[in-house]
Curated annotation (Swiss-Prot):
It is found in: Host cell membrane. A lipid is attached at residue 2 (N-myristoyl glycine). It is a lipid-anchor. It comes from Human immunodeficiency virus type 2 subtype B (isolate UC1) (HIV-2). This is Protein Nef. The N-terminal domain is composed of the N-myristoyl glycine and of a cluster of positively charged amino acids. It is required for inner plasma membrane targeting of Nef and virion incorporation, and thereby for infectivity. GO terms for cellular component: host cell plasma membrane; membrane. Residues 70-79 have a biased composition (Acidic residues). Residues 122-138 are annotated as: Mediates dimerization.
Amino acid sequence: MGSAGSKKQSKQQRGLRERLLRTQEEPYGKLSEGQRKQSSRSPGGSDKDLNSPSCEGRNAPRAEGGGQQDTDDSDEDNEVGVYVRPNRPLRSMTYKMAIDMSHFIKEKGGLEGIYYSERRHRILDTYLENEEGIVSGWQNYTYGPGIRYPRTFGWLWKLVPVDIPEEERGAETSCLVHPAQISSWDDIHGETLAWRFDPLLAHDYVAFNRYPEEFGYQSGLPEKE
């Protein structure tokens, strides 16, 4: 029985990766390893280069065992590889759970370099609510512009603006369903954002320290009229 349960959990985890994280070999709309390292050397800057994304994957057959980041909007919303109903009692996100879930997601493929969108935001919320019983509403970030820091202390994934070079804004990335385009639609500042893992966020509550006004009464500052 234990073996069957482990296989079921492993299948659900693969479902999340296929639906949200996609495969590491997948080139469409994801930052390369070299580009991530270049960005990490410039904490205050944005990524200057991207893999050249393609819209071909929209109509091309899916490779066995993998998906394409620019085709996930055509999938069924409910097919995220998780339980239909919460598998555990509902509970609020805590610092320890945020740390654990951040590392869990990193170990299972990570969000690193994946374009952020409201739809992927909801998929992640749904997964953690149904699998871990964590009530949605915890996944909030500072308003921007610039780097968006998580407002939930312990969540180690921030959102970093990504610059798309002018020469790459041609036919390939002009496809409206491409995540490089959709991400900027979801952002009030029109920036294309990608997830970035930052372990230092476990010790430094950047969102609260830099932007206390965004926390309202919790900051101790007088609220605006």
